[in-house]
Amino acid sequence: MAIHLVIIDALNLIRRVHSAQPDPTDIANTIQNTCRTLQRIISESHPTHIVAVFDHLGSDRGWRAEILPEYKQGRKPMPEPLLNGLEKIQDAWWQLGIDSLLSEGDEADDLVATLACKVAQHGEKVTIISTDKGYCQLLSPTLQIRDYFQHRWLDQPFIEQEFGVKPQQLSDYWGLTGISSSQVTGIPGIGPKAAKEILSQFDDIEQAFLSPDLPKKYRTKFDQHIELARRCKRVSALKTDIELGFNLQDLRFTANETH
């Protein structure tokens, strides 16, 4: 039987469902609505294996903040009623046949990336359910990203239209432009248009920096800020080598079995 692993970016989904509610303290409604959303996702995607990956919620901002101290600094905390209701949400998802994987010190996106790439590299189909465009750098013939809320695939044509670069250049793109929502600055004075121009001429930041053909209008910026660009690229890239401690069989979708 062909394998299809569906990975739910859990907090990405939960926050969007919760923010649309009129009463943010009504966690029972959040549970009901997230379960309804997941049932539709399952109905549309027909997974053989499925898992929901959650961020750890400690004060440690992880390895990225060690490289770039301002990374995600000052980000709004999760609303307390929602934070207190996460365990109940996970229990409800378990009843649907969806187990939860909680990251411990690693960001959820690195866990998602590692799991997705390990399975996709064996030629099996993987779908990541998330609105996070950061996952687009993982795209491959067997790995796809679905933005459920916008009813669209974050695929190669989407990346071309949105960023004008190849999937494998996205971390370089963000190394140049930054990611404002995560306090990743990039090179001051280089925006999307300039990054697209640079990465249409060069494969990556290093090739551009070392080339005598880098346009003069960018040379001073690169010379002054190359180390910052390298750090921004590193924090924008997803890790795909985390030790997982389980195998694919543990994620088999068992909706019709008793939990």
Swiss-Prot record:
Binding site for Mg(2+): D109
Protein's gene: xni
Protein name: Flap endonuclease Xni
GO MF: 5'-3' exonuclease activity; 5'-flap endonuclease activity; DNA binding; magnesium ion binding; potassium ion binding
Any Pfam family: 5_3_exonuc_N
UniProt-listed InterPro entries: 5-3_exonucl_a-hlix_arch_N, 5-3_exonuclease, 5-3_exonuclease_C_sf, DNA_polI_H3TH, FEN, HhH2, PIN-like_dom_sf, Xni
Role played: Has flap endonuclease activity. During DNA replication, flap endonucleases cleave the 5'-overhanging flap structure that is generated by displacement synthesis when DNA polymerase encounters the 5'-end of a downstream Okazaki fragment.
Cofactor: Mg(2+); K(+)
Chain ranges of the 5'-3' exonuclease domain: 165-255
Assigned EC number: 3.1.-.-
Record-linked CDD domains: H3TH_53EXO, PIN_53EXO
Family that this chain belongs to: Belongs to the Xni family.
Gene Ontology biological process terms from the UniProt entry: DNA replication, Okazaki fragment processing
Region of interest called Interaction with DNA, as start-end residue ranges on this chain: 189-194
Keywords annotated in UniProt: DNA-binding, Endonuclease, Hydrolase, Magnesium, Metal-binding, Nuclease, Potassium
UniProt cofactor note: Binds 2 Mg(2+) per subunit. Only one magnesium ion has a direct interaction with the protein, the other interactions are indirect. Binds 1 K(+) per subunit. The potassium ion strongly increases the affinity for DNA.
PANTHER family on file: 5'-3' EXONUCLEASE FAMILY PROTEIN, FLAP ENDONUCLEASE XNI
SUPFAM superfamilies to which the protein is assigned, alphabetical: 5' to 3' exonuclease, C-terminal subdomain (SSF47807), PIN domain-like (SSF88723)
Ligand binding (K(+)): L176, I187, I190
HAMAP family to which the protein is assigned, alphabetical: Xni
